[in-house]
Amino acid sequence: MPVVWTIARKELADGLRNRWLLAISLLFALLSVGIAWFGAAAAGQVGFTSVPATVASLTSLATFLMPLIALLLAYDAIVGEEEGGTLLLLLTYPLGRGQLLLGKFLGHGLILALATLIGFGSAALAILALVPEVEAAILLGAFGRFMGSSLLLGCVFLALAYALSSRASEKSSAAGQALGLWFFFVLLFDLALLAILVLSQGHLSPRLLPWLLLLNPTDLYRLINLSGFDAAAAGGVVPLASDLPVSASALWLALALWAGAALALAHGLFRRRPI
């Protein structure tokens, strides 16, 4: 375990040196504070509206940003080390491939955790300080759920990035595959489900479609954050799952299983990768 933490600290130090942590934190802070105050500007209203509306808007934003940032952070974790000549050097030490992968996962996860806490937490603190009529318990509960699930979603895509990096032959290939993966889960998946729903002309059981959302971690993420709120705010196919007989804890478990399965896949691919 000390070896794993050594790798994790090295990745965190690289993130600090490369300004990844600073850039992600500033991006999250600026966008989240902007959405909290100007999210309803299109309707002619400027200022904080409500906790559900703010969380729904932030969830839509993070659905696009968090997977992309995680993929960009980790797509070259393996193939980049190999191209730089450091992977072979690292594996000459008493360090297993699983330990190396876990250390990178923890290090990159710490970068995302700190950026999420600093960036999105600043929006929560700003709302508490500037909007006295907001109930602190409701706000902190909603933002706590939002930040925790955002981090878990990021961990899913970190692990998927490791899987891509473990099978890619060069960094440019891994980058292209990472963007393709982001496009599929964030944009194409829901469009495909809507197309299937329309083209089936009622032949597809309406009970089946909501369960298909569990196959997409970004839809799981949206369901977690919109539980208890108006699911229609999510748009897309997520409102179809408003009557899904699954508890919030089961949704959390499903998203955690996504992260575990993706990390196991990455480990399997990395073990079979010739060095």
Curated annotation (Swiss-Prot):
Keywords: Cell inner membrane, Cell membrane, Membrane, Transmembrane, Transmembrane helix, Transport. Its main location: membrane. It is found in: Cell inner membrane. The chain crosses the membrane at residues 20-40, 60-80, 111-131, 146-166, 179-199, 250-270. The keyword Transmembrane applies. Coiled coil: none annotated. Pfam families: ABC2_membrane_2. One of its GO terms (molecular function) is ABC-type transporter activity. GO terms for cellular component: plasma membrane. InterPro entries: ABC2_NosY/YtrC-like (IPR032688). Signal peptide: none annotated. Required for the assembly of the copper chromophores of nitrous oxide reductase. Could be part of the ABC transporter complex NosDFY. The complex may be composed of an ATP-binding protein (NosF), a transmembrane protein (NosY) and a solute-binding protein (NosD). This is Probable ABC transporter permease protein NosY.
